[in-house]
């Protein structure tokens, strides 16, 4: 009977240890906030926008947006990056 109690206690200790180590690992990874910068251009081309964003910020994504919904074509390049 005593052996089963020790096995249960040991199993609970192992599970608790794994949980604590997992929680510490999540905290160590950290969370990077996303920022964006909008650049005015005459006519935004997706490929050029992405290249421009990567030049300004090492790891970035770029997308073309319109300054106003009624604009005929996208005229702004929005860079999204970790700040």
Curated annotation (Swiss-Prot):
Q: Which UniProt keywords apply?
A: Antimicrobial, Disulfide bond, Fungicide, Plant defense, Secreted, Signal
- InterPro entries to which the protein is assigned, alphabetical: DEFL
Signal peptide, first to last residue: 1-25
Tell me the compartments it is located in. Answer: Secreted
Q: List the disulfide bonds.
A: 35-83, 44-64, 49-77, 53-79
Q: Record's Gene Ontology CC terms?
A: extracellular region
Q: Name one GO biological process term.
A: defense response to fungus
Family to which the UniProt record says this protein belongs: Belongs to the DEFL family.
This chain belongs to the protein called: Putative defensin-like protein 150
